[in-house]
Amino acid sequence: MAKILGIIGGGQLGLMLTEAAKKMPEHISEVIVLDPTQNCPASKAGAKEITADFKDEIAISELAEKCDIITYEIESGNSEVLKKLESKCTINPSPDTLKIIQDKLEQKKFLTKNNIQVAEFAEVNKLDE
């Protein structure tokens, strides 16, 4: 049975995801995007829209109610809200992953801990450091 795909972000990447999904009707029956811009690029490829801020808890919950799968094309999503909604639909990448990539210091620490090379970095907590 084909699934409904929700995408947080309807910009250029959302447009490309929508176009790709439309080529797989046996897997994806519909695409719904959440984006603050009405008539965002993804809507021009046939995605339905929920017009709201990327962090809007009510809008993200509405997206989860309407979709079987949620992904995102922008790091600005609300990882805490998505975490609460994991039982309602599949969310990939996971809200935990989103939380890590939203904080570049935490992202570098995570990558280093997992033996993935990153450029040298230093943690700075005050302006005089």
Where are these regions (language model features)?
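Active-site nucleotide/adenylate-binding loops and adjacent lid/helix of ATP-dependent enzymes
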Residues: 100-129
